[in-house]
Amino acid sequence: MADHPAVPDDASGDDSGSGLPPEIEQLIARLTGGPVDPELAKAFKDMGIDRVDPAMVEMVAGQMQAMFSGPDEGPVNVTLATDTARKTVSQAGDSVVSEGARRQVAEAAHVAGLWLDEVTIFASAGTITHAWSRAEWVEGTMPAWRTLVEPVAQGVGAAIGGAMRAQIQQLGEGALPEGMLPAGADPAALLGQLEPMLERMSGSMFGLQVGQAVGALAAETVSGTEVGLPLVADRSVALLPANVEAFAEGLGIDLDQVRLYFAVREAARVRLFAEVPWIGPQLLAAVRDYAGAITIDTDRIETALQSVDPTDVEALQSALQGQLFRPEPSPGQRAALTRLETYLALVEGWVDVVADRATRGHLPQSDALGEAVRRRRATGGPAEKTFAGLVGLELRPRRLRDAANLWAALESAQGQEGRDRAWGHPDVAPTAADLDDPLGYVERAGGAGESEALDAAIDELLRGEAPGDGDGR
């Protein structure tokens, strides 16, 4: 190569013999895990990539380098998701939490714990409290988001790969547009070489979407687990002072009361997740069951991409958002969604009832605050809509009021102990059918208790003991 008197214009300084611009060749080599295959290079050249304006090549390469920089992180590029979420909250406005605000949150959490001790059998999960900025909430909850979203990302990636392979199997060289591939090229072999790049692209695009969704949620959520999911790993009570203040604006309620009310709700939710260890895995299992049946609507994707500049990564991501899922879920997915929504409703319904009992005698505006929370959930917001479009799941429980009625009825019949013991095992916890008939569930739960007492008495008699005298004396 050194003997050549000049570098051809279409080689853009390339000395590898591929004829591709060096920026593009280096990028393809890194994404495919080795030297660029000559057949693949020729396919790109036949598409005209070597004749693209150098400035455009540099811009596209820069975008791709940013998207694929760093190690392969699997189905979701969490580094990209975290960076995107932090940029989102920074653009919306975020500030460092003052020491005064941290003390106020710690004091509110302490008082909330004392009030909850009076109304639930679930013990405090600990004394750790956090007063988080929006960026700190992103950092603190991103590991849980990864665990939640990865099954969906895997399902999407597998469905996309399967759809592409199925289409290529139906195509021969003659079925592709003229000049798309070099003569004699095997489309399936080329796809095999591109699969590592497609997997990283899928992980990066999903990371970008997760980051935007979590960033939008960080601008609205008032506490660590307000969405009804166990997002905080250390079982701490976390509030976002800036978002609590934003919620309080226009309510005409003292900020101290608002802070205390949300501290009670968050502390109650943290106790529930700590004392009911099966609820978190059940939520995740429902997401996995949903994700395992994901199918890709390739026709909708093709329609969405027809008017998009393929070099514009953000436009590409925007076009795909909401287009990856078929309009109608499969029966298996509907069952998974029903389970997920039921558990979320049960969690938030229980929190509603317990928070009401804990604050009723202490906060003058307790009822007004409860109604404000219900209005906020009923109307929804951009965060809920963003995440629903991202993974096809509705994170806001649709049947919250039914769940709250069920817990209140159970408490009325059996007291707070009976209410809380209904969480003892997923097999005895209320179901979607029970939300349709709360009073029927309460009657059945009461009957089960009487039956257990009768069985215990009979067992004692068979052992020759007096009923109620467990030691036989």
Residue ranges and their predicted role:
Residues 1-157, 415-473:
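N-terminal low-structure segments adjacent to metalloprotease catalytic domains
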Residues 80, 85, 92, 99, ...:
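An N-terminal structural lobe/cap that precedes and organizes the functional/catalytic core
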Residues 105-242:
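Auxiliary, metal-adjacent structural segments of Zn-dependent hydrolase domains
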Residues 116, 204-225, 273-325, 335-363:
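Post-HExxH zinc-binding segment in Zn-dependent metallohydrolases
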Residues 202, 243-264:
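Short pre-active-site segment immediately N-terminal to the catalytic Zn-binding motif
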Residues 229-245, 313-330:
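A short mid-domain helix/strand-loop element embedded in enzyme catalytic domains
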Residues 257-277, 407:
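Active-site recognition of the HExxH zinc-binding catalytic motif
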Residues 328-473:
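Pan-zinc metallopeptidase signature
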